[in-house]
Amino acid sequence: MDARRTNQETTGMAFNFRSFSVQKLASIAPRYLPFADVASEDVPLARLLRLSLFQVTVGMALVLLVGTLNRVMIVELAVPATLVAGMLALPLVFAPFRTFIGYKSDTHVSALGWKRVPFIWKGTLYQFGGFAIMPFALLVLSGYGEAVDAPRWIGLSSAALAFLLVGAGAHIVQTTGLALATDLVDEEDHPKVVGLMYVMLLLGMVVAALIYGALLENYTPGRLIQVIQGTAVVTVGLNLFAIWKQESRNRARAAEMENVIQPTFRQAWTSLVARPGMMRILVIIALGTFGFGMADVLLEPYGAQALGLSVAETTRLTALLAAGTLVGFGVASHLLGAGGSPMRLGRVGALIGIPGFVAIVLSPGLVGTPLFLLGIFATGIGAGLFGHATLTATIRAAPSNQTGLSLGAWGAVQASCAGVGVALAGLVRDILVGIEALNGIQAHTPYNIVFMIEIGFL
């Protein structure tokens, strides 16, 4: 009896400590975490933070693909930057479907009354499948162990499939997860809750970049495989925990939706773009995404080839960029909360990005690494201001019954332009490298020309 009582007391202490930790985090967060004031008694901050874990898994995937694997494939595995950029742009194939995914989740009919959760789970499985294929593709590309005699095209095609699955899964999870977050709060709080989700995305990217950098301090192909496999398991675990009991079962709602005549996708899309200012907002998002996004595929190789940074050091660049973006989101939260104009704030973000890229371009010939890091941080701030401003403008311009569709449209334009920008950046870099071999220009010149193109877009 005494042993049982002791066990119960121990269990109770553990439970109380866990509850205390969550409550303490929820009490501290409103003071320091942008958009944390969106929480209410019905939807406490602890619940929103738990839901936001789906953004953490998306951030992990972005860091791994755009940061670590991008540099490893170009520098260590000697894969042409055009091929790597093409692989990173493969999720572009799925990006336009974000609008359709948002529409389907708005109108989805389920026996349990769920709208968003089934799509989040499907996206999670896609991500896991991509991460499951990726290690073996990289083994073939690296010629590691028995893969030394395997045809190189097998590694390239398998890596492309893995990138596509991870990207498609991230698109599905992010679009429907953001829509689920808006379902939980009042309509006037939609921009805040989406902003909170993106803050958690950036925090996830920072933490993931630091962890990946530490794990890959002594890089080997085998260690990279372990990191990817661990990411696959963590992704499934975090997403399951994130969606657990977030969307209530409602059979009455399911029966009601079966009797409602839903508009077709074409009708819904026509209605959305007919809203005043919506097309202008989407065009601005496209230009700004080109301006900030083309550098994603080049920053890590640029740091390695122009400044001699290691794998661990270039992986941490993603953390610095995300930290700058987080600062931008925080400033945007304060200014928009005070009644600032989203479009005016978006212009300020674009203007801040210009000197950031100028600093990156000048870094090899002047101060070197410190100026390079300062430029990355500045572009992160500009991207954060621009991203939150355009996101808020998009949500405010859309009707309340088309939240998923509007978020899908914003994500589709952003992701599509980011994918095209990444592919163009790699292509331009490779073409200029060929010219470099003829004219003997410096190694960082092809990268700098791409950065100047981005300045033009901004």
What are these regions (language model features)?
Residues 1-46, 149-162, 172-178, 184-286, ...:
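Intracellular loop-helix junctions on the cytosolic face of multi-pass helical membrane proteins
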Residues 67-83, 297-314:
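Short amphipathic helix-loop junctions that connect adjacent transmembrane helices
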Residues 81-82, 156-157, 187-196, 311-312, ...:
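Loop-to-transmembrane helix entry/capping segments in MFS-fold secondary transporters
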Residues 94-98, 127, 191-216, 411-425:
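Glycine-rich segments within core transmembrane alpha-helices of 12-TM secondary carriers
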Residues 96-113, 216, 328-344:
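Helix-to-loop junctions at the C-terminal end of transmembrane segments
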Residues 120-152, 351-367:
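C-terminal ends and interior cores of transmembrane alpha-helices
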Residues 172-185, 385-399:
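Intracellular juxtamembrane helix-capping segments at the cytosolic ends
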Residues 346-390:
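C-terminal transmembrane helical hairpin of 12-TM major facilitator-type secondary transporters
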